[in-house]
């Protein structure tokens, strides 16, 4: 595409080891004035997912990438989306005998969005957390009346089918600030738990106009799906 014709990119990659055991891998990608990305990794038993042990770290600075909007296929979408002048990404990922994990933080315009999680597909177990600290949604979607967000989400459990007895999960969400249209809709909390096909939880909102407090209860089985609010 013409927008990329005058952008210089440098790439460096090195690896040592075998296809089964990679002792060290390094990757560097840079584009003057726009991109600096570095990553390193190592892995053992790479071809066996149940025995694989691997770790990786990455960090990158992304500057003045607004020109990339020209690559979007929709003119309307190009008008709605923005790319902050500086975006920083830091994180790590790993695998340990069937369990996969990641932790990363994205920073832009004075705010941060962090993700941390662990997942084992064989055991169907998961533990994930998302946190936003003064994260500027308006820096990415300026036309949607969105503003700053402060929130924390956490989910953990075992099993994916909510109708099975073995499935257990808990969810907690706390939204301290959620700006929309110049107003703060924060103060929402959600706690929910599913255990032995029994659902329980509560929803609250400290907004003076709502003062919401709801209890959630229910039963989830293959024969009956019932959820009530009180």
Language model features with spans:
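Interface amphipathic segments
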Residues: 1-230
């Amino acid at each position: 595409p013409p927008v990329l014709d005058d952008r210089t990119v440098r790439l460096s990659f090195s690896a040592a080891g075998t296809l089964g055991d990679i002792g060290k891998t390094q990757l560097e990608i840079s584009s003057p004035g726009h991109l600096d990305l570095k990553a390193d990794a190592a892995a053992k038993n790479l071809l066996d997912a149940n025995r694989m042990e691997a770790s990786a770290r990455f960090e990158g600075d992304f500057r003045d990438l607004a020109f990339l909007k020209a690559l979007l296929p929709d003119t309307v979408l190009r008008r709605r989306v923005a790319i902050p002048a500086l975006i920083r990404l830091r994180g790590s990922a790993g695998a340990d005998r069937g369990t996969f994990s990641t932790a990363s933080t994205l920073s832009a315009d004075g705010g941060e969005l962090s993700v941390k999680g662990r997942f084992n597909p064989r055991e169907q177990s998961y533990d994930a957390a998302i946190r936003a600290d003064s994260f500027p949604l308006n820096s990415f979607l300026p036309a949607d009346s969105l503003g700053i967000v402060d929130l924390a989400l956490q989910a953990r459990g075992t099993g994916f089918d909510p109708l099975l007895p073995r499935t257990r999960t808990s969810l907690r969400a706390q939204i301290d600030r959620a700006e929309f249209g110049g107003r703060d809709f924060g103060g929402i909390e959600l706690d929910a738990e599913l255990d032995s096909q029994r659902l329980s939880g509560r929803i609250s909102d400290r907004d003076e106009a709502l003062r919401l407090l709801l209890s959630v209860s229910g039963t989830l089985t293959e024969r009956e799906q019932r959820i009530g609010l009180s």
